[in-house]
Amino acid sequence: ALDFVADLTGEPCFWTAGKSPARPYYTGTTGKIMPYFLCVGQESHVNDYVEGANAALIAADVVRLLEGDKAFICGKGSDTLPPPTCLSCQTRVATYSVSLPAKAVCYFNVLSDHATPGDILNDLKDIANEVLLDSCKQMHKTALELALKGADVPITEKKGRVLTYKDLVETAEQKLGGRKEFARQQKAFLQTLDSKTDMREA
């Protein structure tokens, strides 16, 4: 085991520019996390809108709730950190299609000066659960509005669940018969990707 005497960071900061040319050292640093949301809906032709679930709607609701969320803003005065912001949001469709997209992804820049990754994950799970509830309510409302106009559509309440990456891996391991088989298939998949692939885009 290692015994740490001190933790130092020499990363340059904007506010040291123009000052005396001495090498600065800092007693702390900003924590950065890039949470990634994979939103899975249900594909259906646009004519059968109510029978599907548009993953783009779910992703849009994630952005609506997390973008600039004041609950994540840390610091005070000149040390106030920027709020969460979405760096990418897109549907996952291979080609042009007139079906509701079944998958959409978005990821964010989240900064903190005190929260642990576990703390942030718990807060993000709360947001994801709120998103799921809002999206399902919106889809149900749309179905009711179509029915009121005389459309022959099924009126069913959408349901879903929020899974962390850990939850997803554990589920996959159970379905595949264990951790070793999951690791083997995961490795095989990763080897099919171009070596220059940005893993956030895989």
Q: Where do the model's predicted regions map?
A:
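Acidic/histidine-rich catalytic neighborhood of metal-dependent amide-processing enzymes
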Residues: A1-G28
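Metal-dependent amide/peptide-bond hydrolase catalytic core
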Residues: A17-K19, Y25-T27, I33-M34, G41-A202
